[in-house]
Regions:
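Catalytic phosphate/metal-binding cores of nucleic-acid and nucleotide-processing enzymes, i.e., regions
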Residues: 72, 135, 146, 156, ...
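Generic long, charged, amphipathic alpha-helical segments
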Residues: 663, 667-689
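Conserved "right-hand" nucleotidyltransferase catalytic core of DNA-directed polymerases
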Residues: 207-285, 357, 363, 370-619, ...
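Metal-dependent phosphoesterase core characteristic of DEDDh/y 3'-5' exonuclease domains
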Residues: 142-153, 168, 174-178, 271, ...
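Conserved RNase H-like, two-metal-ion catalytic cores of nucleic-acid enzymes
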Residues: 58-59, 63-69, 74, 212-352, ...
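Short hydrophobic beta-strand that contains or immediately precedes a catalytic carboxylate
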Residues: 49-51, 247-250, 311, 332-333, ...
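A polyanion-binding, active-site-adjacent surface
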Residues: 2-209
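Short active-site oxyanion
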Residues: 64, 126-129, 303-309, 500-502, ...
Length: 707
């Protein structure tokens, strides 16, 4: 929807005041007074209001809000939605620029101190809608628990200043967009997507301010207990569907076994409720009360090849419907995949998709999936279904404008294949799985014993304890001495306590840091909390130390054992039962995702798109050996070899890339020869490592990341 072009008369721009701020308690003030305050500005009668988080350096120098890079983005967005900056009141949640290194806690405290000033300022413009840019600003209107990554774009009605309710729509701050943000999620070239989202959100505020009715009306009905009324709701809805020739369908499911990880698996899920919607209204009915006639009515429209069916994630809903006796025929559309095709870097959950296009209040917060009664579940289901149907039109336009029709068709085809793969599952050989488990445990125990023996080596143990005492002393305990040396001595005394014999804990960050430093590894990079980091990418730069190599091998094998071996089958550890992914037929049913930003597939529960290969040096067997084919079947593997590089070679017509593929060369080895001219003279094992290393900058360049 486009706003009408306004008749332009240059307005008189007025400035806000600093009155009301509690500067004495503000962490950004100077001696109880605002430090270079930047007040709001705009016309005496603004159409609507923009509230940012706080002024930056350019704003402080010029004394005006939003005049730096963020301001230029806001101004560009206003031009895009055909609104003049001079017609909008622009201000910030805080008056003063946050000092360098300010924490979110300090920013929130400054916002609270400035809130009386902002309330007084906005009370001059009662009822005017607000675009709140950034989490700090949005939390001032929507509460401290508000998450900008989850709720950006949603409409809230708030009485902020005592003058009555006004519409507030939070959006991602332009500064976050300039850093590559999208308001949730990330990936290549996401700043463009973030800018589009900002424009959508500002346009919604703009249209509401001008009286255009774009609010999402909640036209829903539901039935939890009366079979007669439920059948009547279905009958009336089916009549509307046959007239409209399209509808949306959504399912709510549950799992009646203790395998909680299966709650979102179509292969195990059972129907709890089903929702149907046209663009005008939606219904939701409890599955347990549906009559056979009502089920036949639903089944008839699902099987009608002349009616368009809309789903948000049909990869899940369609297999669930199939398991309950329904056949889905004819055109099938998917709003999740459409959104992925048009906006690949944005979050694709239904609420975020809907709030991008509609002025709608959040409804997901009212019901947590899998919890609550039918009285809570069915309204949630009906809103989901109605949102799916109403998202169809704007998403169809977005896909067309993005020239993403073919991408969407490919995604739909892949989703159907992924749904079949999920339901069918993958057979796992229980005997081979047990062999892998024993082999992994043996190697892990051996590596742990080697590291443990090294810790208690005569030349290292004393240094290790001193380092460990220092690391542990950096975090004070209750009743600890203030003096650091005394605190270290206290920790050393605790280690010598005969009642509590000292144990080396290989999974403790402090123990690992102390051990590696005692071995001479110069670790120094710290986490945000001030601890020395032992992340994989940091340790890999010290892999020439044998202790580091042993630790990395231990961690990798422990992770693989848990993820690809032990989690596949249900196991009992003492009194505790850990349920595995495999069903009663020894099949696992991975959940496949075809809407990753790169276009590659992903899977979970368990991750199955890339079973790790054998590595004798790391003591790692071939984990795919436990995946088997049943008698009379064959196990087939496909690999789109270096597909991204081949596409780039074709699109760019780069002579270097074309020569590689036309002459059947290995692109990774060719790039490795450029970086390491002596690549071909190095040992085979070393060449394998270098070839793997070069893949990171290659794929970083392919997907728009840092090189």
């Amino acid at each position: 929807v486009e706003a009408p072009v306004e008749e332009y008369e240059p307005p008189l721009i007025v400035r806000g005041k600093t009155d009301g701020a509690n500067c004495f308690a503000c962490p950004f003030s100077a001696m109880g007074k605002p430090k270079q305050p930047v007040t709001g500005e705009g016309p005496e009668r603004p159409i609507w209001i923009i509230v940012g988080e706080g002024p930056g350096q350019n704003e402080t120098i010029q004394g005006r809000p939003f005049v730096g890079q963020s301001g230029r983005m806001v101004t560009d967005a206003l031009v895009k939605i055909r609104t003049r900056r001079e017609s909008v009141w622009i201000t910030n949640a805080t008056l003063c620029q946050p000092p360098s290194g300010s924490t979110d806690l300090q920013k929130r405290e400054a916002r609270r101190c400035c809130a009386p000033r902002l309330q007084k300022e906005l009370s001059e413009f009662p009822g005017r809608p607000v675009a709140a840019l950034g989490a700090i600003a949005a939390q001032g209107f929507c509460g401290e628990k508000f998450s900008i990554t989850q709720m950006a774009g949603a409409m809230h009605e708030v009485d902020f200043d005592g003058t009555g309710s006004r519409v507030v729509i939070p959006s991602t701050h332009p500064a976050a967009i300039l850093r590559g943000g999208t308001g949730g999620g990330g990936g290549a070239h996401t700043s463009d997507l973030g800018y589009w989202s900002l424009c959508y959100d500002l346009q919604k505020v703009n249209l509401i301010a001008r009286g255009v009715d774009i609010r999402f009306t909640d036209d829903i009905e539901y039935e939890t207990s009366d079979p007669v009324r439920a059948e009547k709701l279905v009958e009336d809805m089916v009549r509307d569907i046959r007239a409209k020739r399209e509808f949306a369908c959504d399912t709510e499911t549950y799992v009646d076994d203790p395998k909680q990880h299966s709650a979102l698996q179509a292969a195990h899920a059972k129907l709890n409720a089903i929702g149907l919607a046209t663009t005008e209204r939606a219904i939701s009915v409890a599955w347990g009360i549906l009559t056979q006639r009502a089920k036949r009515l639903i089944g008839a429209v699902l099987a009608d090849s002349g009616i368009i069916k809309w789903f948000h994630n049909g990869l899940y809903d369609v297999p669930v419907l199939n398991r309950h006796g329904f056949t889905v025929e004819g055109p099938r559309e998917d709003t999740l995949l459409m959104h992925h095709s048009a906006f690949p870097g944005l979050p694709h959950d239904l609420q975020r998709v809907t709030t991008q296009f509609h002025a709608i209040t959040p409804w997901k917060a009212e019901y947590r999936h899998g919890q609550g009664s039918l009285e809570e579940l069915l309204p949630y289901n009906a809103r989901d279904t109605l949102a799916t149907m109403r998202d169809a039109a704007p998403l169809t336009i977005a896909v067309k404008r993005s020239n993403a029709e073919k991408t969407y068709e490919v995604d739909k085809a892949m989703a159907r294949a992924a749904a079949i793969m999920h339901v069918k599952g993958v057979p796992i050989d229980r005997a081979v799985n047990e062999e892998l488990r024993v082999g992994f445990k043996t190697h892990i125990d051996r590596t742990r014993a080697e590291l443990h023996g090294k810790v208690f080596d005569e030349g290292i143990h004393s240094r290790f304890k001193e380092r460990l005492a220092f690391e542990q002393s950096r975090r004070a305990r209750k009743h600890d001495p203030l003096d650091m040396d005394e605190r270290i001595n206290k920790r050393l005394d605790e280690m010598e306590n005969p009642r509590k014999p000292f144990k080396f804990m290989i999974d403790s960050g402090d123990h690992i840091v102390a051990f590696l430093k005692a071995c001479g590894v110069p670790l120094s990079i710290q986490t945000a909390s001030g601890r020395v980091s032992t992340k994989k990418d940091i340790l890999e730069s010290f892999a020439h130390y044998p202790e580091v190599r042993a630790l990395l091998t231990y961690r990798e094998n422990a992770k693989l054992l848990n993820t690809f071996v032990e989690r596949l089958f249900t196991r009992q550890y003492g009194d505790k039962i850990v349920y595995g992914f495999a069903d009663e037929d020894d099949r696992v049913h991975p959940r496949w995702s075809v809407h990753k930003i790169t276009g590659r597939w992903g899977s979970e529960a368990p991750g199955s798109q890339n079973w790790p290969k054998a590595d004798k040096k790391k003591g790692r067997p071939n984990l795919r050996s436990q995946v088997i084919a049943r008698p009379g079947r064959a196990l087939v593997a496909f690999d789109a070899k270096q597909l991204e590089a081949r596409i780039i070679a074709l699109l760019s017509a780069d002579p270097f890339l074309l020569d590689i593929f036309n002459n059947d060369k290995d692109i990774h080895s060719e790039f490795a020869r450029i970086v390491w001219p002596d690549f071909d003279t190095r040992p085979v094992d070393e060449r394998k490592v270098l070839r793997d290393m070069i893949k990171r900058p290659e794929y970083g360049a392919f997907y728009g990341g840092a090189v």
